[in-house]
Amino acid sequence: MTDEGGKNQGMKVMGILDIQNTPCARESILHGAGGSLVAGLVHFLATSRVKRSFDVGVAGFMLTTLGSWFYCRFNNAKLRVQQRMIQDGIKNKVIYEGTNLDPTQKKTGDQ
Amino acid sequence: MAHPTQLGFQDAASPVMEELLHFHDHALMIVFLISTLVLYIIIAMVSTKLTNKYILDSQEIEIVWTILPAVILVLIALPSLRILYLMDEINDPHLTIKAMGHQWYWSYEYTDYENLGFDSYMVPTQDLAPGQFRLLETDHRMVVPMESPVRILVSAEDVLHSWAVPSLGVKMDAVPGRLNQTAFIASRPGVFYGQCSEICGANHSFMPIVVEAVPLEHFENWSSLMLEDA
């Protein structure tokens, strides 16, 4: 069975989240795991309460994953907008070069 | 196009579908986190030895589990509404095509410049050439120029149908006596498949939609050829 565009069959966490093919997912989960470990460990070292440390670890996982996810997706969205603007700019430059609609020509014309 | 055992969306072929994919990733991540939390709480509840039969109220947790879901819903609603309004934008289409649903085929009319119209019937399984897709191929494809906004006016001649192409992020009901409008931009050349998405009788599953996005000069050549053949 061939996959679309040569994509690998991604690893699905909990059967739903495709980490490999979803942008920012892998980084967010890894940051979440790290944050969970740190939060749980620090709490345990401070209080020696095992169960509560696990709770803090899970809360840390959720908050770190969410924070990392939003930050990465926001930057990703900005990059996509820039990419689209650059693509349109290249296309317009190719189409309008040498005509009176050429944006570079307008700037030199104003001087 | 779809492949066997596929669970997720097809690759996006239009900017709107790209945005929908991104929103889906966003919503799925939130769903994943909620599921993780619920699973953890279930395991904690099942494995605890603590029991307290005298809890009457608990203001703090009630406040948390009221405000937190509200915040989560706002985080989902804002991008959702953004895409909803994005999908309703019709930005000066370069081409208008009428897609009419019949029992059981689609017909397309390109009437901007000349009167070009043709029917699009499914290719029966026994007539498929090697490499063609069963129940998806048609004898005539709807050809559109790539990277150009295209408006589709969808209606039906008999019963309800629905014109849908998943990779373009388009689905619009074809209602007899009503003209529905949708639009898309095919960001890359290719062949995009869809199927009728409203039950319309015995052969509802056998009236597919095929959209072929080509560079503008190829589109012009194709339309000239089609007019000559008509």
From Swiss-Prot, chain B:
Primary location: mitochondrion
GO cellular component, one term: respiratory chain complex IV
Bilayer-crossing regions: 15-45, 60-87
Pfam families according to UniProt: COX2, COX2_TM
GO BP: ATP synthesis coupled electron transport
InterPro entries: CcO_II, CcO_II-like_C, CcO_II_C, Copper_CuA, Cupredoxin, Cyt_c_oxidase_su2, Cyt_c_oxidase_su2_TM_dom, Cyt_c_oxidase_su2_TM_sf
Membrane topology (Mitochondrial matrix): 46-59
Membrane topology, record value: Multi-pass membrane protein
Reactions listed under catalytic activity: 4 Fe(II)-[cytochrome c] + O2 + 8 H(+)(in) = 4 Fe(III)-[cytochrome c] + 2 H2O + 4 H(+)(out)
Compartments it resides in: Mitochondrion inner membrane
Gene3D superfamilies named in the record: 1.10.287.90, Cupredoxins - blue copper proteins
EC number(s) from the headed UniProt entry: 7.1.1.9
Domain of life (superkingdom): Eukaryota
SUPFAM superfamilies the record matches: Cupredoxins, Cytochrome c oxidase subunit II-like, transmembrane region
Record's cofactor remark: Binds a dinuclear copper A center per subunit.
PANTHER family: CYTOCHROME C OXIDASE SUBUNIT 2 (PTHR22888:SF9), CYTOCHROME C OXIDASE, SUBUNIT II (PTHR22888)
Similarity-based family: Belongs to the cytochrome c oxidase subunit 2 family.
Subunit structure: Component of the cytochrome c oxidase (complex IV, CIV), a multisubunit enzyme composed of 14 subunits. The complex is composed of a catalytic core of 3 subunits MT-CO1, MT-CO2 and MT-CO3, encoded in the mitochondrial DNA, and 11 supernumerary subunits COX4I, COX5A, COX5B, COX6A, COX6B, COX6C, COX7A, COX7B, COX7C, COX8 and NDUFA4, which are encoded in the nuclear genome.
Function of the molecule: Component of the cytochrome c oxidase, the last enzyme in the mitochondrial electron transport chain which drives oxidative phosphorylation. The respiratory chain contains 3 multisubunit complexes succinate dehydrogenase (complex II, CII), ubiquinol-cytochrome c oxidoreductase (cytochrome b-c1 complex, complex III, CIII) and cytochrome c oxidase (complex IV, CIV), that cooperate to transfer electrons derived from NADH and succinate to molecular oxygen, creating an electrochemical gradient over the inner membrane that drives transmembrane transport and the ATP synthase.
Protein name: Cytochrome c oxidase subunit 2
